[in-house]
Amino acid sequence: MLNYDCDVCVAGNGPSGMIAARQLALAGLSVIIIGSPNHQMHKFGETLAGAAIRLLLKLGLKELVETLLNTSNDNNSFPPKVTGNMAFWGTEQASITDAIHDPYGLGLRIDRQRFDTLLKQYIQLKNITHLNANITNLTKQNGLWKITLDGKMLITSKWIIDATGRSAKILKLLGVQRYRGAPLVALYRTCVPEKNISLNKTIISSNESGWLYAGKISEEKWVLGFHTLPKFAFNLRNHASHWDDIINKKSGITDLLGQLGLSADIYAHDVRTTWSPENSGEGWVACGDALLAFDPIAGQGLFNAIYTAIKASEHILSAEQKITLESNYLKEFQKIIKVYEHRRYSLYKEEQRWLDSAFWKVHQYYQ
C-alpha cells in the first residue's frame, strides 16, 4: 500500500476544492487533492457572476479571468459577457435587468469543464499533489486522519476538507446530517434558436409546472433547462414531445427566440437545496456544494464555491496559527443560510398565477 502524508487532504477537485487547496498551499501547507475517477456529471455553460469574478481577481487569479474574457467557449468567437436577465415571472411581461447596473460588473457565460481545467492549471504549486481515487475508508488515530483510497493508498493528514459537491461524501462518512429542501430536478438540453441567437441575456420564465432557464453557450447554441418536481421531470424526460408544450405555454421564450431546434440528449440533475448545520469540526471543514448547494434560481453556485473555499482555508489557517478571525465561519454560514432561504422563499412567492399547482405549493412553503 502506498503511503502519503500531508497537512491537508482536500476531497474533491472542483472549483471549491482547488481554490481551498491553493490558498493553503500558498500559506506553506502541504496539500493532497483527491478527485473522483468515476465522476462524469455533464456540465453545461454556466454564468460566472461579476461578484465571483471579483473574488478571483482578489485571489490573484487575474490571468485566469483574462483567459476567460479573451477566448471563447467551444472554439467559437462570441462575446462571453452576460449583459443581464429577462424574467417572465409572475406575469407574461418581461422584467429586464441590465448587468451594467450590477456593482460587481458583467458576468461571463463559461464552459464549466473548460473553467475547471483552466483553474487546475493555475493552481499548480509544488506543495499540491493530485490523486484520482475513491475514498473507501476514513478513521482518526491520535489526532490524525487515516484516509484509505481504493484499498491501495493511505493518506495521513491533520485536516480533511469536504469539497465533494452535492454528494458530500466526507460529511456522510463522518455521520453529519444534512438538510434537504423541497424536491427539485433540472432537465438540461441544448438548442438552436430561430432568431436573436446573439442575445446575451439570461432568460428565466415560470409556468404551472416549474420554471425555464435559457442562456447562450456558443456562437450557435443555447442551453435550455427546466426545473420541476421529480415525477414531472420523469415524464418530460421520457416524452420529449412534451417540451413543446413547456416552451410554448406563454413562456416568452418562443417570442424572443422563435422555434427552437432541440437536441436529442437530455440531462437530469437533482438540484434541490441542501446544506449541513455543521460546517466544521475537529480536524475537518466543508465548503462548496458539500456545505451548501443552492437552488439554481439563486444563480450563486460558483460564487458560493469560491467564497466558502476561501473561508474554509482561513478556518484551517487560523487554527494552525492560533489566530482569531474577525468573522466566525459557522456564524457567517448560518447568516448566509438565513438570507438565502428568505430570498428564495420570497422569489417563489412572487408567482401567484398557479397557487393550486403541485410545484408552486411545494416551493412556496417556507421551511
Identify the residue ranges that each predicted region occupies.
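Predominantly flavin-linked oxidoreductase catalytic cores and closely associated redox partners
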Residues: 122-253
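C-terminal helical "tail/cap" subdomain of flavin- and related membrane-associated enzymes
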Residues: 314-367
